[in-house]
Amino acid sequence: MHVQTKSKKKHLLPLALIIAMAAVMAGLCVVSWSERGRLQNELEVQQQLNVAQRRVQQAEQELSDLQEEYDKLLKKQDSSKPNGEIAYQTLYPELMLDPLTGYTQEQKVYLTFDDGPSERTIEILDVLKQRDIKATFFVVGSNLNSEQGQEILRRMADEGHTIGIHTDSHQYRSIYTSVEDYLNDFKKVYDKVYEITGVKPEIFRFPGGSVNGYNGDIYQELIAEMMRRGFSYYDWNVSSADATGSISADTITKNCLSGIHAYRRSIVLMHDSAAKKTTAQALPGLLDTLIAEGYEFAPLTRETLPVTFAYPD
């Protein structure tokens, strides 16, 4: 009986060793998977940091490029002064803002509307109010002569939207004849906005964009002068293409979504003149889609880093 017990023990020893080794291996696997998870988390965090750093570097480079271009234009402008000052620089001293200390670059969608106000603007304001979204309206001075236009402008200001200058006349051939002619037009609509709302506009959009088929002889000088005065101007990187004539609401929506999906920071060009019925019709569905996709919206301010067109070679 004693011999049989010893025999059983001998058989049990290898089994115990196998079980012990299996337990050790299982522990090592647990540690290994835990370590792998920790390393994976660290890698993901580092990748996110790298992406954020690249974005910061890109923003800094864009700001540096803008400042460099501005300095070049100022230098060119200064070299042409016969007595240290060009005549148009003495015009409208009230059109001077305090120096800008820097730009912000938020990853948001900036909705902008040109050529209003009109009855379309009322529809657009209603849609924006229902969704608590603020936008930017670059207004035309000739639309502010009516009581309706003035009421709409006051509503823009009261509801927290940004009011920017577009033009008084929207006559490209006349406003782009010279820097002085542009300033004369700018001053007219600036005064109207201030008188109606008490708001002094700080941003603007050149009719046709900063570089267009009408201002080729003066655009560098004109941009330098407006920047010298402290105003920020904005082109766009997403277009609804609603300025091209008759275009459906579905096409406007597709154009906007395609552009917005391509950029982390979008300045969207749309129009709110009376003829742009499909723009107002497209807006609710467009906004609801973007909201569902997690996009955030903001109005432009003078401190928003501009999107601007490149100068032609």
What are these regions (language model features)?
Residues 13-22:
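Sec-dependent N-terminal signal peptides
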Residues 135-143:
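A short beta-strand-loop structural module common to alpha/beta enzyme folds
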Residues 170-269, 273-291, 295-296, 302-313:
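Catalytic domains of cell-wall/extracellular-matrix polysaccharide-remodeling enzymes
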Residues 113-116, 142-143, 167:
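Active-site metal-binding loops of divalent metal-dependent hydrolases
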Residues 2-6, 17-18, 27-111, 117-130, ...:
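N-terminal pre-catalytic segment of deacetylase/amide-hydrolase enzymes
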Residues 125-132, 147-166, 195, 223-230, ...:
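Acidic (Asp/Glu)-rich catalytic clusters
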